[in-house]
């Protein structure tokens, strides 16, 4: 089944709604520039109340590896999502005690070989492909062009677990799963009524759209 990550959690009630709807992972954004920014104490409190088998993921843009390690340990995060090109192989290897998801935002001239080289240097095999925007690291609601996304996943499938992000919402995530077949999907703005405020109905619709696509793939293959 396609894994589902609901990102930009800022409230305990939203975290619980997402977990009950069937989300596999929840994202907590620590970027100082994000409208979905959460502080460490609030994140820690929410994570402590999560049901078992729901994975808490920290999203980092500006923090140093040392800061990431401290925040992950304090909050009980299990995964660090590195959402900036500043996190090169050297910095990634300094992150300890958690799994790493490295984000790539394909811009003009991007080559898949960059992803493979990153794996060779770090051993990291978990990636997230998000739409490129010079103004914001993520959560823009913009989508990766379909042909580009298809090529990315086809060319990285043999050595990675990759999630698709960027503009996904209940109305289009089913088609994305069917056409691209990512290992997982990630959404923030696609299930919100406002930045950082999740819409419980949209979350349930998003999860059901993914599961419906999963069933169609199972039945056709």
Curated annotation (Swiss-Prot):
Assigned EC number: 5.3.1.24
Protein name: N-(5'-phosphoribosyl)anthranilate isomerase
Reactions this protein catalyses: N-(5-phospho-beta-D-ribosyl)anthranilate = 1-(2-carboxyphenylamino)-1-deoxy-D-ribulose 5-phosphate
Keywords tagged on the record: Amino-acid biosynthesis, Aromatic amino acid biosynthesis, Isomerase, Tryptophan biosynthesis
GO molecular function, one term: phosphoribosylanthranilate isomerase activity
HAMAP family the UniProt entry points to: PRAI (MF_00135)
GO process terms (BP): L-tryptophan biosynthetic process
Pfam families in the cross-refs: PRAI (PF00697)
Cited PANTHER family: N-(5'-PHOSPHORIBOSYL)ANTHRANILATE ISOMERASE
């Amino acid at each position: 089944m396609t894994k589902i990550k609901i990102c930009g959690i800022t409230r305990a009630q939203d975290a619980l709604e997402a977990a009950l709807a069937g989300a596999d992972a929840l994202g907590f954004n620590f970027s100082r520039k994000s409208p979905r920014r959460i502080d460490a104490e609030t994140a820690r409190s929410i994570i402590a109340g999560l049901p078992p088998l729901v994975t808490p993921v920290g999203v980092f843009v500006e923090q140093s590896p040392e800061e990431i390690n401290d925040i992950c340990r304090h909050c009980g995060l299990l995964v660090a999502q590195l959402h900036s090109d500043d996190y090169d192989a050297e910095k990634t290897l300094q992150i300890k005690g958690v799994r790493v998801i490295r984000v790539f935002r394909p811009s003009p001239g991007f080559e898949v070989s960059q992803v493979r080289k990153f794996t060779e240097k770090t051993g990291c095999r978990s990636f997230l492909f998000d739409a490129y925007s010079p103004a914001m690291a993520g959560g823009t609601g913009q989508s990766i062009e379909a042909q580009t996304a298809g090529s990315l996943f086809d060319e990285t499938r043999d050595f990675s677990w990759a999630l698709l992000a960027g503009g996904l919402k209940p109305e289009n995530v089913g088609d994305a799963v069917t056409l691209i077949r990512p290992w997982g999907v990630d959404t923030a703005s696609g299930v919100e009524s406002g930045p950082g405020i999740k819409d419980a109905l949209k979350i349930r619709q998003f999860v059901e759209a993914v599961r419906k696509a999963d069933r169609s793939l199972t039945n056709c293959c």
